[in-house]
Amino acid sequence: MYFEITGQNSPAAKTVVLSAGLGGSGRFWQPQLSALGQHFRVITYDQYGTGRSAGVIPSGYTLADMADELADLLASQHIERYHFVGHALGGMIGLQLALSHPQCVERLVAINSWPVLDSQTRRCFHVRQDLLLNSGVAAYVRAQPLFLYPADWLSRNTLLLEQEEVQQIAHFQGMENLLRRLNALMNADFRSVLPHITTPTLALCATDDLLVPYPCSQALAELLPDGEWAQMSYGGHAMSVTNSEQFNGILLSYLLMDTGIAKCELALNQSNTSAIHL
């Protein structure tokens, strides 16, 4: 799989691995690279079958396959311990890594992820799937921003969206690859195994996320033995893009928590799950 390493190059620097959502591209994390790179060695990658990681996704593909592919890649680079930050599908890959490779994941941030697929998320996925199958790639790509970004942000960024649309159509991962990856995501159910994941985990969400209702993140955190949750009031599903300054601050506060650099205060809520108060 294609990957890039940026940020700190000191042997003593800790590593943070960034995993995108269904689109799969490491380029999704561009707004985070500078902030994270001041403190960490940063690894971004294109998930198998997407972007610059060409390949055909096999039938029966699962999140466990996605996690094992990444674990093997990192092991080949002698990277044995790392923080992991994943957006939606990427967060689910992180949960699977923490379950099947617990010795590798030091801290996990799962952004707009869930214990089991919510009915609203399922509805959105079915609409997107129908668009792809019945109207084609261009219609699928054109509709995608509606699920990712707040309406006012969409209005202010028309030119950027038009440019991205051209690129996304040109580099589309392929209908069969996307549908098999989507099927793996929709079928994932972590409810029975979350109590066994002891990795410190932050479930981060945006209250205006259309695709994944924000209570999914709270439910995820509450099922984890060392789960914490944080909410952003604005940004939509892709708040790492639309509200990157606040997002980066929360991310760094959590990842640097044990270093004394973090600035956000943590307080326990009534469910004994920590919530970051913004």
From Swiss-Prot:
Spell out the Pfam families in the cross-references.
Answer: Abhydrolase_1
Catalysed reactions, semicolon-separated? carbamate + 2 H(+) = NH4(+) + CO2
Record-listed E.C. numbers: 3.5.1.-
Chain segments annotated as coiled-coil in the UniProt record: none
Entry GO MF terms: hydrolase activity, acting on carbon-nitrogen (but not peptide) bonds, in linear amides
UniProt keyword annotations, A-Z: Hydrolase
Question: Gene3D superfamilies of this UniProt entry?
Answer: alpha/beta hydrolase (3.40.50.1820)
Into which EC class is this enzyme placed? hydrolase
Q: Which GO terms describe its biological process?
A: nitrogen utilization; uracil catabolic process
Q: What does this protein do?
A: Involved in pyrimidine catabolism. May facilitate the hydrolysis of carbamate, a reaction that can also occur spontaneously.
Question: So what family is this one in?
Answer: Belongs to the AB hydrolase superfamily. Hydrolase RutD family.
- Protein name as annotated: Putative carbamate hydrolase RutD
| Originating organism | Yersinia enterocolitica serotype O:8 / biotype 1B (strain NCTC 13174 / 8081)
